[in-house]
């Protein structure tokens, strides 16, 4: 039986830090679902469809990654996808408290759902989609932090 994992997030937009995490997850699991949350409560720069397309392009080189959008409760989505592992990236101690709360709630809702936390490579440990967008809005160079297709899409949005 295949070991299926879900790496959920808003990915607005997907960064090289996210790519680092999903790439490493593909070495641990047979199938990784990059699950892009609709996040209606967040004001996203990119639509769900745009985020899915950008992530599909950025992960096309990874053979065992499937990119899907979702708007369901994470535990329900995981159950429907026959996944028993959630992948989460932890950049700093500040991420841990929130992620721990999510992990406990998800486990309450779906007891067989395990959360696996991966630390990004040092090179990406300080970046976030929000920070990259903010720097780009002020004409800072963010080429190093984004896949090329995502960089081009971000520049087009900001033009």
Swiss-Prot record:
This is Phosphopantetheine adenylyltransferase. It catalyses: (R)-4'-phosphopantetheine + ATP + H(+) = 3'-dephospho-CoA + diphosphate. It comes from Shigella dysenteriae serotype 1 (strain Sd197). One of its GO terms (molecular function) is pantetheine-phosphate adenylyltransferase activity. One of its GO terms (biological process) is coenzyme A biosynthetic process. Its EC number is 2.7.7.3. It holds the Pfam family CTP_transf_like. Pathway: Cofactor biosynthesis; coenzyme A biosynthesis; CoA from (R)-pantothenate: step 4/5. ATP binds at residues 10-11, 18, 89-91, 99, 124-130. The lineage of its organism: Bacteria, Pseudomonadati, Pseudomonadota, Gammaproteobacteria, Enterobacterales. The gene is coaD. Substrate binds at residues 10, 42, 74, 88. It is found in: Cytoplasm. Reversibly transfers an adenylyl group from ATP to 4'-phosphopantetheine, yielding dephospho-CoA (dPCoA) and pyrophosphate. Its cofactor is Mg(2+). One of its GO terms (cellular component) is cytoplasm. Belongs to the bacterial CoaD family. Keywords: ATP-binding, Coenzyme A biosynthesis, Cytoplasm, Magnesium, Nucleotide-binding, Nucleotidyltransferase, Transferase.
């Amino acid at each position: 039986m295949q070991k299926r994992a879900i790496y959920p997030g808003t990915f607005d937009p997907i960064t090289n830090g996210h790519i680092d995490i999903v790439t490493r997850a593909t070495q641990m699991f047979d199938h990784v679902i990059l699950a892009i949350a609709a996040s209606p409560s967040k004001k996203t720069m990119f639509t769900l469809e745009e985020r899915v397309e950008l992530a599909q392009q950025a992960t096309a080189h990874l053979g065992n990654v499937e990119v899907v959008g979702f708007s369901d409760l994470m535990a329900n989505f995981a159950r429907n996808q026959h996944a028993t592992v959630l992948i989460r990236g932890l950049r700093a101690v500040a991420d841990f408290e929130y992620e721990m709360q999510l992990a406990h709630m998800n486990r309450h809702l779906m007891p067989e759902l395990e959360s696996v936390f991966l630390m990004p490579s040092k090179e990406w440990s300080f970046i976030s989609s929000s920070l990259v967008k903010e720097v780009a809005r002020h004409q800072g160079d963010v080429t190093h932090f984004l896949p090329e297709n995502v960089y081009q899409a971000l520049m087009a949005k900001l033009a």
